[in-house]
C-alpha cells in the first residue's frame, strides 16, 4: 500500500 514494499520499489 505504498511506493515501497520491503525496501523494494513497486
From Swiss-Prot:
GO molecular function list: toxin activity
Q: In which tissues is it expressed?
A: Expressed by the venom gland.
Localization recorded for this chain is: Secreted
Q: Does the keyword Hydrolase apply?
A: no
The GO cellular component terms are: extracellular region
Q: Which UniProt keywords apply?
A: Secreted, Toxin
**Identification of the protein by name:** Toxin To35
* Species of origin: Tityus obscurus (Amazonian scorpion)
Amino acid at each position: 500500500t505504498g511506493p515501497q514494499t520491503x525496501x523494494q520499489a513497486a
